[in-house]
Amino acid sequence: MRFAASIAVALPVIGAASAQGFPPPVEGVTVVKSKFDENVKITYKENDICETTEGVRSFTGHVHLPPDDNDFGVYRNYSINTFFWFFEAREDPKNAPLSIWLNGGPGSSSMIGLFQENGPCWINDDSKSTTNNTFSWNNKVNMLYIDQPNQVGFSYDELTNITYSTINDTVYVADFSNGVPAQNLSTLVGTGSSQNPWATANNTVNAARSIWHFAQVWFQEFPEHKPNNNKISIWTESYGGRYGPSFASYFQEQNEKIKNHTITEEGEMHILNLDTLGIINGCIDLMFQAESYAEFPYNNTYGITAYTKEKYDAIIHDIHRPDGCFDKLAKCREAAKEGDPHFYSNNATVNAICADASSSCDNYLMDPYQETNLGYYDIAHPLQDPFPPPFYKGFLSQSSVLSDMGSPVNFTQYAQAVGKSFHGVGDYARPDVRGFTGDIAYLLESGVKVALVYGDRDYICNWIGGEQVSLGLNYTGTAEFHRAGYADVKVNSSYVGGLVRQHGNFSFTRVFEAGHEVPGYQPETSLKIFERIMFNKDIATGELDIAQKPDYGTTGTESTFQVKNEIPPSPEPTCYLLSADGTCTQEQLKAIKEGTAVVENYIIKSPAASKGDPPPTTTTSPTAAPTAGSAMLQAPVAMLAISVLTALAFFL
């Protein structure tokens, strides 16, 4: 049964979750049963929902894995149905490399990256139509967007009736045996996952194990992708600063086990030929990045003084004092090393110590920032931030779109079950077996390219902390990387998009005028960086072949801090029904709850919100210093009018 609403718009799918009523029946999907395991299958549909370029194919589908009582030592009594969206390259897909894209969270859907950052289309402000993205990452690369771990986005364990509150951005399991409640502005109904935190991966390494199983099935048995180029890259963002190193190193370790015949099971012996790991605004390791949560709001290149000297000093003290953040992190890591060396998160004592470390550091580092009323993902924007636009949530709520996708579930941008599961074991406080910086070093030693790319307006995983990670790596090229200077990233004949330090296969780039979701702010710059890395060109100019010059290093200044930025105009406020918790004022939320809000295409027209105050700045003008690039965003016109801060799950 499907329901419609009797307001100014048809009520959508569950927004930060999902549901325009229930999805239509799944029809017309192709089913491929595994030749290795009768209980494994792939279901998919070809469609042109987002990629409309003539002759360029795209597919949505699921890889279905049954419960497993010995998943590399982890008992898993739930099914995994992992959603993917595959776009062939617009140019020569048969010979193009492939990149996986993963958003972070933990628990955030990769549809964020697809529709707000680097996919083939932008969603217009009617939440129904699309505009071609000329800077799409599938221009020359086959792109595979994956919703993971289980229950994220369109991925699910078991189909479950749910309701969704637009007011507090929460999904609830529902019992509709006595009838389905009518939908209204504040309550939507639909189909989702079980919401059971025990029915998903509970840490980064277990997520790596699951995604490796997905990859074994997809790359061997998905019939629509049979390339001549077998190179695979992973690009990720935010909490992907942990996903990326862990997943890529796990893939590489499994490759070694396949080669030395440690792994001999049929169907699990496909080599995943890793080429590149790219991390955008990654939260990688708190030991390297913790101090940046005090430094960035206090002293940044935009002259925004969100913190006083007293607040800055207090946070630094909480990091270093006895039983402070660093002490708790060290205790967690020592306990994990002794009590859970394989990262199964099945030791209650270790979980409790690490959960305490994670929550304590979060309190010390991030709670003070809430008082600033500035954006977590863009320090130059207000907390209720409408950029990048959330229009894709309404787009994915359309019955026609869900039908074309062949999805049995409504869209869920953030999986609460995943967040609970990861936070409950203190995943963010502890590294994996090698450590995430150790993983990056291992990948570099294995010949894998690694690129760290950071927008310079993001607070939550800011570039100052990212730079510290880059300088803290210990690998054979460490000294040469440190000696390299920062060079301009030349995007075109008239625009410099950032500064890069690069030596050989490793690079750190600061992208000007960009928040957390860098490609959403600077599509052209991001595409240039992405393609240069993918095709072995130097990031600064794109003219040198790094494969032929393995000792190449950039020259320039030791720091980038001398390059200052102008504060951009604050975006016009836009209250979007499906992102109400992150874009609407208290007055607007009240009107939504009472059913008095005037809504058009999911946008609250009345009551209207007023633009907030500009961020606080220093009294010293930075005009004497060089100015970064141009203050104008490169985002297309269709995106400039309205945008969104997705609800602060943890990281996107």
From Swiss-Prot:
Membrane topology (UniProt): Lipid-anchor; GPI-anchor
Q: Pfam families this protein is in?
A: Peptidase_S10
**Region forming the signal peptide:** 1-19
Sorted alphabetically, the keyword list is: Carboxypeptidase, Cell membrane, Disulfide bond, Glycoprotein, GPI-anchor, Hydrolase, Lipoprotein, Membrane, Protease, Signal, Virulence
Q: Low complexity composition bias: which ranges?
A: 618-627
Disulphide-bonded residues: 50-121, 325-361, 332-354
Propeptide intervals in chain numbering:
630-652
> What protein name does the entry list?
Carboxypeptidase S1 homolog A
- Organism per entry: Trichophyton equinum (Horse ringworm fungus)
